[in-house]
């Protein structure tokens, strides 16, 4: 199975390392130095498990700046793009998530998209209506910084579901 992961922060890189043990993963980022680090099996973030997995495990993992190609070839796209909270407007900035969804819909509308980013209540339903896609779902992350891969390997809670109306 081919899986693309949009974003290589704590959430994206930890899920990439986890999945790349058994599937082909292409991690996508906008920052060349992060892509180069991952392709050289060095972690661009501080996380003991990620550092160890990149250095020692046989991971089927590559990183790229080319989201279009990565998403076109993917069966699943995990979206771990930043959604910073703006305390002045009291809203999450979901523009990075929406950019990924728009590109996936353009190049591979049949791919299943799993949003791991923090998003507001009702966002998944709203974006599914906007795109006309039932292949978008949300799976919240419960990760600690510097322990992200560990928390993915040994989760305290797993939850994902498409709309019950599907």
Name what the model sees in each region:
Residues 150-158:
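Acidic/polar active-site rim loop that often engages polyanionic ligands
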Residues 159-166:
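Conserved small/polar residues in nucleotide/adenosyl-binding loops
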Residues 78:
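N-terminal Rossmann-like NAD(P) cofactor-binding module of classical short-chain dehydrogenase/reductase
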Residues 1-42:
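NAD(P)+-binding Rossmann beta1-loop-alpha1 motif at the extreme N-terminus of oxidoreductases
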Residues 73-75, 109-110:
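Short acidic/histidine-rich motifs immediately flanking catalytic phosphotransfer sites
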């Amino acid at each position: 199975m081919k899986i693309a992961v949009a974003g290589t922060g704590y959430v994206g890189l930890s899920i990439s390392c986890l999945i790349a043990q058994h599937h082909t993963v292409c991690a996508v980022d906008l920052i060349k130095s992060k892509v180069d680090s991952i392709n050289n099996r060095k972690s661009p973030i501080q996380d003991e498990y990620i550092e160890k997995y990149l250095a020692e495990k046989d991971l089927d993992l590559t990183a790229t700046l080319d989201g279009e190609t990565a998403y076109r070839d993917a069966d699943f796209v995990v979206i771990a793009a930043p959604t910073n909270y703006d305390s002045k407007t009291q809203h999450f900035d979901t523009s990075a998530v929406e950019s990924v969804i728009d590109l996936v819909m353009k190049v591979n509308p049949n791919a299943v998209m799993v949003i791991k980013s923090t998003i507001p209540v009702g966002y998944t339903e709203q974006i599914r209506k906007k795109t006309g896609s039932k292949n978008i779902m949300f799976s919240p992350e419960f990760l600690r910084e510097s322990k992200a891969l560990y928390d993915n390997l040994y989760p305290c809670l797993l939850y994902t579901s498409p709309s019950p109306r599907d």
